Design a protein with these regions (language model features):
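A cross-kingdom feature strongest in bacterial/archaeal respiratory oxidoreductases
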Residues: 1-96, 103-110, 121-167
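Short, hydrophobic alpha-helical segments
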Residues: 111-115
């Protein structure tokens, strides 16, 4: 592309304004954003929402169409954790489920677009050069944690990250 696209916040803001015709959302938890209520409102405001997901979620409940995708145990791939570290994983179970990549490629083909992706190696070839970036990085506003509730005598608070944060 000749122009920079929108980041997640930009896409959600555009959806909330009615500037997008549709949203395709994959594996997003609204609680990962600084303002989950704004994310819910933006998704609800989008005229058409497609969700690619392995389980029921707030997004799937708001979606017009939910397309199931293979969970990590049924495909090869790589997670990029919040620190930007690559965490590759292999397929543990043989299944016939479609991967996120397969579903996205088929959706694009239906709309007459060629993503240029025929194999997982195509994604690696495009993404790997980005991992070695040494230039300036985007500045992100810090997001504080919610206050820890008070605890009384003999009580405890369990504070844990979501599963697979560091997968």
């Amino acid at each position: 592309p000749s122009e920079r696209g929108l980041d997640a916040d930009g896409m959600l803001a555009a959806a909330a304004r009615g500037d997008l015709g549709a949203l395709v959302v994959g594996g997003v938890d609204v609680r990962d954003f600084a303002d989950p209520d704004a994310v819910r409102a933006a998704i609800a405001a989008a005229p058409f929402v497609v969700s690619l997901e392995v389980r029921s979620s707030e997004v799937t409940r708001l979606a017009d169409v939910v397309l199931p995708v293979a969970p990590p145990i049924e495909k090869n791939g790589t997670f990029i954790n919040w620190e930007g570290r690559l965490r590759p994983f292999g397929q543990a179970v043989s299944a016939r489920s479609l991967t996120d990549r397969d579903v996205l490629v088929r959706l694009a083909e239906e709309f007459g677009a060629d993503l240029g992706i025929t194999a997982l190696s195509d994604l690696y070839a495009e993404a790997n050069p980005l991992m070695d970036w040494e230039g300036a990085r985007e500045a992100f506003a810090p997001v504080g944690a919610p206050p820890v509730p008070g605890v009384g005598e003999g009580q405890a608070v369990l504070a844990a990250h979501k599963p697979m944060l560091d997968a």
